[in-house]
Amino acid sequence: MTLHCQKIGHGLPPILRSATADLLTKYGPLLFDWAARHGSPLNLVWPDALRENLAALKGVLTERRLEHAIYYGAKANKSPGLMQAALSAGAGLDVSSLYELRDARRLGADGARLVATGPAKTSAFHQELINCNALISVDSPEELEDLIHGLPADAGQQSILLRLRPRDQSKSRFGMPPDAVVHCLARLAGEGRVRFDGLHFHLSGYRRETRVAALREAADLIAEARRMGFFPGMIDIGGGLPIQYVDRARYKAHLAAQAPEDYRTGKIPDSFYPYGSTLSAADWLHRLLEAEMNQGRSVAGYLAREGLTLAMEPGRALADQAAITVFRISRVKALGPDSHVIFVEGSSFSACETWFASEFLIDPILVPATKATVQLPPVRAYLAGHSCLDEDVISNRWLTFPTAPRAGDLLVYANTGGYQMDLLENEFHRHPMPARFCVIEDAEGRPNLVPDTIGEV
């Protein structure tokens, strides 16, 4: 494999899990065989990576003897293999659509392992959640009324959380302000078919400080609910645990050195995901629990004293290092004396950050199909998909390849399991949907593919 950089000294090589690095360095011919058989782009998934990530988070919580509930945010990708890995490792699933719920049920999840989030649940979604007694996060007073209306007269108690919209999130359409939470509690006071289990929030961004502030607001509402005669036992902090895609120092150097001319658009994107996070998800969670909550108590101390379960729905954080996306190069086209465009078999719908006016700030890895007989000059290029859309660009960054790519070579993007590999995938131009497989090692440690479908995983 060949790593490259955008500017000498300011490249962004991805952090690679050993299994991924071994596939690229030791089993290159196997990778080409898989691409030949299954097409490009090809999404490869490692369920054991999710289990490792889950164990790291659970370790932080069990070390503090905190009651907890971790639900894998299934919306992060479409992999049943990762959903099954979460279930087999003791986690639950966060389902945000009727179809995610049905997949979870087909994988064997009962209602006790499911939480349903999202603001726009349909009556059909509500009904199937009620039928399996899944935990439902209620987004608004309007949703609460719809839910109550849909409950059978002889229904057992339906467990719910009320979704809080913290004060500093006033422009968000998700959740409800504290006074609306209290209004919902008053509505529930005479409704025996619904059990109020606690509060839920999910914030944009990755700052611990905003979570602590939201926890303080939630604590006040937990106290108010108990004064009203309820027995809440959970605070759910949603997701947003950061992960590390690239080395922090390299990332800072890259951001400091980038200039508008480094992009084919002549413009630096306004924002990026924090690819060079200083903390792993487990470290971030550790620091959140140690943060001061109130009256000199830490978050962990507050939860323990109040007898509260800490729930969360990590998506990206559990899918960290769990997938790669493999593109095959179809053509390298010269645009001028020192610039090229590299066309791949596939589209930016399978590496979709440019559709959000940003960039996936991880350098792709070039895996040559054959060894060049002569040393080819470096190539400066951006990456484009195979569609007729001018916007179908995988990377607007000018990338400098010290070894010139050729048709038939592979470009591998690492760590695409979180809202990247299949978030926008489709059959544009009637191309088939990209294939997705789980990578499982045999007894000799050799990687093998298993279809990433329900019934196979």
UniProtKB/Swiss-Prot annotation:
One Pfam family from the UniProt entry? Orn_Arg_deC_N
- Any idea which GO molecular function terms this record carries? diaminopimelate decarboxylase activity
The cofactor named in the record is:
pyridoxal 5'-phosphate
Record-given protein name: Uncharacterized protein y4yA
- List UniProt keywords, sorted A-Z: Plasmid, Pyridoxal phosphate
Which residues get modified to N6-(pyridoxal phosphate)lysine?
Answer: 75
Coiled coil location: none
**One GO BP annotation of this record:** lysine biosynthetic process via diaminopimelate
The organism encoding this protein is: Sinorhizobium fredii (strain NBRC 101917 / NGR234)
